[in-house]
Amino acid sequence: MIRATKLAAVSALVLVAAAAAAQDDGFTKKFPLASCQFISVGGNRYFPLIPGRQLYYSNAACVAAGKCDALNELWITEERETKRITLPIGGTTRTVVTRVVQERETEDGELVEISRNYFANCWPSRDVYYFGEDVDIYKNGKVVGHESAWLAGRHGARPGIVMPEDGFITGSRYYQEVAPDVALDRAEHKRTGFATRVPAGRFDNCLEVEETTVLEPDDIGHKTYCRGVGLVKDDDLELTAIYANPRPDDDNDNDNEDDDD
């Protein structure tokens, strides 16, 4: 999930138990999906899934400092909609209800990308898994491509972990996306236990993740997540506002569902 404008273009137990499955690059690629009971709400302390919540990010400070030429803005909306994704897990076929999270990116006010991302919370570990995304790339107001779109269960793609719940161990490495030749984002834990300030406020108990991809070796991203909030910084983008209006009945999976076909 490295930003389009940049490309341009597990818990400790999980990480240790899956270490034998790590590839030569040292990043864990296979996870104990068979032990998960997946749900589409809740998330975890560093990656909440709260239907109805929207977060707004901007690099206005970077532009004002003369370090960025273009004003980039990002809206992340945790939709009330879910998507059912069917895939092989542990030798059987399972259907997982995922939460739809929309990301809308603009550059100097012009729409550049809208993606619909699919996440589910593994119970009881509360690790949040990433099941894919549908992507629309825009130019001059028209869709011109769908680069980086992928879906677990298709063409050999498998879920990756986007954020473990416990055991944030500095140096841990794992794949967030496992879609051969399409999307292979990886995460490495860099530091934890610090505070940060952004336009939306000051946040404590934060951690930093470095993201890379074997498909674009020169592209390196850094994200900051803070407890109880989620993503606070994405390179030069900073959390500027949080809008929350979840409904009482959003604590179940009886939302509008979209099948994976």
Describe every region a protein language model picked out.
Residues M1-A9:
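Bacterial N-terminal signal peptides that target proteins for export
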Residues L13-A21:
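Hydrophobic h-region of N-terminal signal peptides that target proteins for export
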Residues Q23-D253:
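Conserved functional acidic sites
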Residues N252-D260:
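Asparagine/serine/threonine-enriched low-complexity, disordered tracts
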